[in-house]
């Protein structure tokens, strides 16, 4: 099994500038899922995707002229592995002095390598220079929890902060906070994010939910793992009929990671970059 502590994170790394797929470092999802009550073999209570955006993609055309693009990678949540982010960056940098016939050829290569590493089918989208002007920005929709004047001193995840008024009539709400902060599982470096929670069910106590999201502040876990922990805690403590959790994290090393988990059929998020990204 590949373990996070064996990854390139927190270690000096040589930056290869010619293509090397072996730089990708997969990490199994299952051990961290077991920690949140999802043992191996049990059906997952959610489905979804991890949306990765890469802003520093460059290669050479066959004449040696540099090319640049933005790339989006859509990784299904049911793949057995995630890819450690520093290894992803090193892998992308390995294209910098590599000659590739066309953007389409690069896209096919990225699709193959990422699918191999994650154990599933990864969608790859490239935005080349000609289409950079089509990119849009926008904030997460929803009622802002950060407006609440709460007091807290809890900075490790505490599901008991969550509650819902089960005697009340069901509601449909979309709640948003920009106060999500967690830390890298290996290095302890801060990860900053915005999170959107959409649900149908008994009204969730908003102050408790905000305190709960803030409680991740000293917690060490990868982005995908934090979102799955939020999803399972809200399901267990608040018992909504429908739930979708979407987080957009600020970029590091030219990459941002945006996990989405839901228990009902709904379109995937539209991947609009927000102002903090």
Curated annotation (Swiss-Prot):
**What is the E.C. number?**
1.7.1.13
Q: Which GO terms describe its biological process?
A: queuosine biosynthetic process; tRNA modification
Cellular compartment(s): Cytoplasm
Which amino acids does the record list as binding substrate?
Answer: 83-85, 223-224
Q: In which pathway does it act?
A: tRNA modification; tRNA-queuosine biosynthesis
InterPro entries from the xrefs? GTP-CH-I_C/QueF, NADPH_dep_7-cyano-7-deazaG_red, QueF, QueF_N, QueF_type2
Residues recorded as binding NADPH, renumbered to this chain, are 85-86, 252-253
Active site (catalytic residues): 184 (thioimide intermediate), 191 (proton donor)
Q: Does the keyword Amino-acid biosynthesis apply?
A: no
* Listed Pfam families: QueF, QueF_N
Q: Which domain of life is it from?
A: Bacteria
Transmembrane helix recorded as keyword:
no
Q: What does this protein do?
A: Catalyzes the NADPH-dependent reduction of 7-cyano-7-deazaguanine (preQ0) to 7-aminomethyl-7-deazaguanine (preQ1).
Q: Which family does it belong to?
A: Belongs to the GTP cyclohydrolase I family. QueF type 2 subfamily.
Q: What subunit structure does UniProt give?
A: Homodimer.
* Name this polypeptide is given: NADPH-dependent 7-cyano-7-deazaguanine reductase
UniProt lists the gene as queF
């Amino acid at each position: 099994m590949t373990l996070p502590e064996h990854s390139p994170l927190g270690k000096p790394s040589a930056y290869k500038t010619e293509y090397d797929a072996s730089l990708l470092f997969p990490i199994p999802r299952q051990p961290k899922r077991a920690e949140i009550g999802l043992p191996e073999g049990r059906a997952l209570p959610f489905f979804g995707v991890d949306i990765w955006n890469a802003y520093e993609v460059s290669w050479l055309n066959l004449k040696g002229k540099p090319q640049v693009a933005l790339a989006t990678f859509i990784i299904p949540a049911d793949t057995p592995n995630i890819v450690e982010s520093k290894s992803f960056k090193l892998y992308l940098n390995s294209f910098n002095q590599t000659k590739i016939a066309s953007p389409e050829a690069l896209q096919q290569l990225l699709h193959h390598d990422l699918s191999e590493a994650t154990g599933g089918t990864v969608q790859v989208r490239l935005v080349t220079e000609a289409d950079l002007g089509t990119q849009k920005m926008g904030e997460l929709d929803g009622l802002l929890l950060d407006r609440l004047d709460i007091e807290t001193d809890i900075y490790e995840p505490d599901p008991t902060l969550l509650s819902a008024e089960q005697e009340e009539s069901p509601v449909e709400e979309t709640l948003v906070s920009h106060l999500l902060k967690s830390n890298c599982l290996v290095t302890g470096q801060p990860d900053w994010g915005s999170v959107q929670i959409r649900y149908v069910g008994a009204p969730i106590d908003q102050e408790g939910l905000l305190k709960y999201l803030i409680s991740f502040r000293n917690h060490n876990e990868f982005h995908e793992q934090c979102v799955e922990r939020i999803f399972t805690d809200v399901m267990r403590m608040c018992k909504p009929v429908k739930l979708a959790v979407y987080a957009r994290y600020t970029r590091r090393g030219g990459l941002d990671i945006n996990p989405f988990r839901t228990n009902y059929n709904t379109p995937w998020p539209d991947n609009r970059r927000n102002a903090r990204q």
